[in-house]
Amino acid sequence: MVLEQYFLLLPEFNLNTIRVSNNPSGSAAKPLFMYNRDGSICYYKSTKQVDFVRTFGIHKVTFMKHLEQGTYYLNKYLFSMEELPNAEQSDMTVEQVATMLDIDRVTNNKNKTLVSFSVAVTLINIETKEEHKFPSLGTAVKFLKNGSYPADQRTLVKRINTNIPYHGFTCHKY
């Protein structure tokens, strides 16, 4: 306690000397860019991450993941800290880019499974070699039940990639 009082009362000691990394004001920040998948069009650039988060509704964790790993956001957009020399600046407004992202989110989310741990499977008929692809085990079980088979999801899980027949089908992840 005495040490705290000493530092608080000492006039030349400054407690506000913390340097903020990635300064949110953008004064010392590196520029960030949003390109199309092949990097030929630059849709947006800013020195602040918060602009991408607030303006376009991209979650900060999602933004950082795609920025750091170099993966494509919505399988279409590339975030980068480097300016690509051959990229042309888009003439779209910020509102148009935000609308484009909203439309792509709806389209992309329709193609996703509802549960992140869902397993996409293929059932292959042993006799005809006909393949039936399903986005989840549940839909594969419904298919088997509609074919008058007493199907069970637990048993189907055990048969994935084992080549053990289940009601005339083999089950594989895809």
Curated annotation (Swiss-Prot):
One of its GO terms (molecular function) is endonuclease activity. InterPro entries: Intron_nuc_1_rpt. Its EC number is 3.1.-.-. GO terms for cellular component: mitochondrion. Keywords: Endonuclease, Hydrolase, Intron homing, Mitochondrion, Nuclease. It is found in: Mitochondrion. Its main location: mitochondrion. GO terms for biological process: intron homing. To endonucleases of group I introns of fungi and phage. Mitochondrial DNA endonuclease involved in intron homing. Encoded within intron 3 of COX1. This is Probable intron-encoded DNA endonuclease aI3. It comes from Mycosarcoma maydis. The gene is aI3.
